[in-house]
């Protein structure tokens, strides 16, 4: 039979373990998040290597990037177009421009967010992306919201214990 104090301590240990596990997962989730605020627009980007879509032996690597655009201003804004600059570790530069994102030109109200995921392939094991969105306020004024530069890196190899 266990002593009541032991059960209490065991319960506290378990709660501490759950809390630290939760905290570590949150920190790992956000360790690769890049943020930038410009013109009252906060842009957060989290890149993710897609091993299942990559073919390393053919020097073909694919990354997804998860983007959140938050309107910190007082007026609604519409995302009109995007501009990306992608540079791989071989120095090859690619520029991508187009209307909206993922086929949409979202209007984002003050305090609201728009989230989407897209991706890019590289013929090298790493690269860097940066860019901007052309935004338009409801009065027709256009301005740029800068996208933070972020790196596209292969995940660290994991060690097998057995």
Model feature map: region roles:
Residues 123-162:
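Terminal connector regions
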Residues 76-94:
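Short acidic, flexible loop segments centered on an aromatic residue
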Residues 69-73:
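Asparagine-centered strand-capping/turn motif at beta-strand->loop junctions
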Residues 96-124:
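Intrinsically disordered, low-complexity Pro/Gly/Ser/Thr-rich segments with frequent PxxP/GP/PP motifs
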Residues 51-61, 74-75, 107-109, 122-124:
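Short, solvent-exposed beta-strand/turn "edge" segments of beta-rich domains on protein surfaces
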Residues 33-59:
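Low-complexity, acidic Ser/Thr/Pro/Gly-rich terminal tails and inter-domain linkers that flank the onset
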Residues 41, 61-63, 67, 114, ...:
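Hydrophobic core residues within well-ordered beta-strands of beta-rich domains
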């Amino acid at each position: 039979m266990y002593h009541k104090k032991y059960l209490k301590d065991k319960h506290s240990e378990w709660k501490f373990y759950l809390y630290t596990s939760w905290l570590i997962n949150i920190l790992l989730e956000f360790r690769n998040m890049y943020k930038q605020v410009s013109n009252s627009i906060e842009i957060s980007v989290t890149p993710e290597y897609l091993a299942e879509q990559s073919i390393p032996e053919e020097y073909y690597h694919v990354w997804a990037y998860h983007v959140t655009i938050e309107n910190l201003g007082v007026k609604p804004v519409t995302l009109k177009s995007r501009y990306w600059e992608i540079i791989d570790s071989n120095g090859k530069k690619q520029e991508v421009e187009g209307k909206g994102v993922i086929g949409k030109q979202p209007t984002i109200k003050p305090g609201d967010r728009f989230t989407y995921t897209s991706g890019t392939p590289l013929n090298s094991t790493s690269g860097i992306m940066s860019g901007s969105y052309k935004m338009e306020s409801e009065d027709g004024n256009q301005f740029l919201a800068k996208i933070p530069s972020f790196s596209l890196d292969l995940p660290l190899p994991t060690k097998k214990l057995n």
